[in-house]
Amino acid sequence: MKEKIVLAYSGGLDTSVAVQWLIDKGYDVVACCLDVGEGKDLDIVYKKALDMRAVECHIIDATKEFSDEYVSYAIKGNLMYENAYPLVSALSRPLIAKKLVEIAEKTNSVGIAHGCTGKGNDQVRFEVAIKALNPSLKAFAPVREWAWSREEEIDYAIKHNIPVSINHDSPYSIDQNLWGRANECGILEDPYAAPPEDAFDLTNALEETPDTADEIILTFDKGIPVQIDGKTYELDDLILTLNALAGKHGIGRIDHVENRLVGIKSREIYEAPAAEVILKAHKALETITLTKDVAHFKPIIEKQFAEQLYNGLWFSPLTDSLKLFIDSTQQYVSGDVRIKLFKGNAIVNGRKSPYTLYDEKLATYTKEDAFNQDAAVGFIDIYGLPTQVNAMLHGGYSNEQ
């Protein structure tokens, strides 16, 4: 009896070729395809996997789990790698790995294969996650082993009658889920080349966006968006709704050269319409609901959390601890944020919360001012005391020092 290997199957170029490659190596292939909100026709993927001679194909709808257990932390933690990338692909990898391990254990498979290259981050994310969840499972990386160029891989697919929606004129590598869309390869590898419009799918070009703005009110409950204009949504449905609305206005396009975990720089084109709107609104709500010390310290945790995710360390003691901290900060992050969507911009122009720490009577400069300005003299004396003592000892500060 042949040994079984579970393959993370997307129906795309890499994993379609990988099925044939693993069969040639003498394994039975158990294909596994997860829906994490990318809108793919899974019936076609299922049929394609079996047509490629996989012995089984498991289709798993994990969209809600993805939104509730993973995207929720991206929102509460304002997670952005290098202050630019909302972790679109990185966020889904631990969940995909978790489901692959479950299928491998259920089918008595000896290992798990993925379609990642040897130059990318995903190979690390998948294999480290698999080791964390079940160290006895082997990891297989067909694309890394065969080391073909993109063009050679396309030629192999054509030669073996493997149907793939890719050609030499448009050789993009695309990954999409509920939280956004990532695109690389082809002309995008030149960091000076402007991305052609066919590189985008979720967002309109600015020239094609409406000339009238949409203004929405996004309601949060403990850091999670729950309503748009008073209508309640499950998180996954809310994100899909915002993707369509914000994408119509050209919001969420990101052109970023990032520092990969494996040591190289990579130019990526991301589309994350809902993510841009939600994160801007969430940050705005935090400005009135977090204390100063938490507001100043939380970005340090956010940066570390984003790097943990980007580097494939979701299943780790540190990430568990970071999640606990993030959760503890969100108890009072509830309220409404008003956002204007127009010509590629998501503009926050109002926020309110029943837990607001903003006191208008203290902030105002009108006659209703409740701030005791006389107290400022004593505060300045105490606050400036170390500076005063230093100046008295050393004769005052000068530019020469």
Swiss-Prot record:
Annotated pathway: Amino-acid biosynthesis; L-arginine biosynthesis; L-arginine from L-ornithine and carbamoyl phosphate: step 2/3
Which InterPro entries does the record cross-reference, listed alphabetically?
Arginosuc_syn_C, Arginosuc_syn_N, Arginosuc_synth, Arginosuc_synth_CS, Arginosuc_synth_type_1_subfam, AS_cat/multimer_dom_body, Rossmann-like_a/b/a_fold
Q: Residues that bind L-aspartate, according to the entry? A: T117, N121, D122
Tell me, which GO biological process terms does this entry list?
A: argininosuccinate metabolic process; L-arginine biosynthetic process; urea cycle
Q: Which family does it belong to?
A: Belongs to the argininosuccinate synthase family. Type 1 subfamily.
Q: What is this protein called?
A: Argininosuccinate synthase
Q: Which CDD domains match?
A: ASS
Subcellular localization(s) per the UniProt record: Cytoplasm
What does it catalyze?
L-citrulline + L-aspartate + ATP = 2-(N(omega)-L-arginino)succinate + AMP + diphosphate + H(+)
Q: Which residues form a coiled coil?
A: none
In short, the EC number is 6.3.4.5
Annotated residues for binding of L-citrulline: Y85, N121, R125, S173, E258, Y270
Q: Which NCBIfam families match?
A: argG, PRK00509.1
Q: Which domain of life is it from?
A: Bacteria
What are the alphabetically sorted keywords of the record? Amino-acid biosynthesis, Arginine biosynthesis, ATP-binding, Cytoplasm, Ligase, Nucleotide-binding
Quote the cellular component terms of the Gene Ontology held in the record: cytoplasm
- Name the source organism: Staphylococcus aureus (strain MRSA252)
Annotated Gene Ontology MF terms? argininosuccinate synthase activity; ATP binding
